[in-house]
Design a protein with these regions (language model features):
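Sec-dependent signal peptide recognition
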Residues: 1-8
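Exposed, flexible binding/inhibitory loops of compact, secreted disulfide-stabilized domains
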Residues: 13-138
Length: 138
């Protein structure tokens, strides 16, 4: 009985979403190429932020307790594109970041301007691998 309870507890603990806080989200970034990022140190954060928004001061992150994960969609030809991190959860030794991408609906009007959608979040520090999964592909 105890073994069953411990197994159930371990399985539940691996699927409980981690808390996360949005640091920045928008459609203007210096990141022209689509990429997913995992940032574990202040030096990595300063470098990423300098590429992302060189004229703005990087938001403070306590890397002794947290890390940053994010998704950049790269350059898009119109408004209406969006990326959103939906959940961050441990799965075994990995931390899985689930996100969604949106684009303008077919046949709708969208401003013809270049955009660079992104979403950056702070999560509790995790030493293991980080995997990014497009929603629905878990």
């Amino acid at each position: 009985m105890l073994r069953s309870v411990l197994l159930a507890t371990a399985l539940f603990a691996q699927t409980v979403p981690a808390t996360f806080t949005t640091i920045a989200k928008g459609d203007v970034s210096g990141q022209q190429t689509a990429r997913q990022v995992t940032v574990r140190t202040a030096a990595e954060w300063a470098a990423l932020w300098n590429d992302h928004a060189p004229t703005e001061k990087a938001p403070a992150v306590d890397f002794s307790k947290n890390m940053v994960v994010g998704v950049f969609l790269g350059s898009k030809p119109s408004a209406g594109h969006e990326v959103e991190i939906l959940a961050v959860r441990p799965m075994g030794a990995d931390l899985v970041v689930e996100y969604t991408q949106k684009q303008p609906a077919r046949g709708t009007m969208a401003a013809q301007i270049l955009t660079e959608p992104f979403h950056l979040v702070s999560v509790p520090a995790h030493a293991g691998p980080v995997r990014f999964q497009l929603a629905g592909s878990l």
